[in-house]
Regions:
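Extracellular domains of the immunoglobulin superfamily
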Residues: 1-128
Length: 128
C-alpha cells in the first residue's frame, strides 16, 4: 500500500509483517519519494496511543524519544530514498505495529501543512 500526500510525496513499507524470534535483529524498511523535511518512526501497541520513537534527516543526524534506548536506531539512504528502522536483540515487548512517516518539505510557511505527516505501517510478530 502506498500513501500519497498533497505534495507528491509517497512512503511505502517494503514488507507488511515481520515474524521474528526473541533475540533476533530486525530491519524494517520504507521507501519514499519527493523532498522531505524529516522521516520518523512510531510504534503502537494494541489499544495504546501511538508512541514516537525517532526522527532522521536525509542530511544525517536526528533525535530519539529516549536517547538511552540503544537497541533502536534509524538510517536514511538519501540516494535510493530508503529509511530503515533497526531493532537489535529483539524482546517480546517489541511486538507492535511500527509506522514510518515523513514530513514533506514545504516551500511556504503554513503551520497546518506540517501536521500532515504521511504514514505507513509494519507489523512485528513473534514466533516460537
Amino acid at each position: 500500500m502506498v500513501y500519497e500526500g498533497s505534495f507528491g510525496n509517497t512512503i511505502t513499507p517494503i514488507s507488511g509483517v515481520e515474524n521474528v524470534k526473541q533475540g533476533d535483529n530486525v530491519t524494517l524498511q520504507c521507501n519514499y519519494t519527493g523532498a522531505v523535511q524529516n522521516l520518523q518512526w512510531y510504534r503502537q501497541y494494541p489499544r495504546q496511543a501511538l508512541e514516537y520513537l525517532l526522527m532522521s534527516f536525509e542530511t544525517g543526524g536526528g533525535s530519539k524519544a529516549n536517547e538511552e534506548e540503544h537497541r533502536i536506531s534509524a538510517e536514511v539512504n538519501k540516494d535510493n530514498k530508503h529509511v530503515f528502522l533497526k531493532l537489535i536483540d529483539t524482546e517480546v515487548t517489541d511486538a507492535a505495529v511500527y509506522y514510518c512517516a515523513l514530513s514533506p518539505t514545504v516551500t511556504e510557511t503554513h503551520p497546518a501543512l506540517y501536521k500532515n505527516y504521511l504514514t505507513m505501517k509494519h507489523k512485528l510478530l513473534f514466533t516460537n
